[in-house]
Curated annotation (Swiss-Prot):
Keywords: Neuropeptide, Secreted. Its main location: secreted. FMRFamides and FMRFamide-like peptides are neuropeptides. GO terms for biological process: neuropeptide signaling pathway. It comes from Karoophasma botterkloofense. One of its GO terms (cellular component) is extracellular region. This is Extended FMRFamide-10. It is found in: Secreted. Disulfide bonds: none annotated. Belongs to the FARP (FMRF amide related peptide) family.
Length: 11
């Protein structure tokens, strides 16, 4: 899976 799953970005 992509690393983006490791952190959450605020809109």
């Amino acid at each position: 899976p992509a690393p983006e799953s490791s952190f959450i970005r605020d809109p």
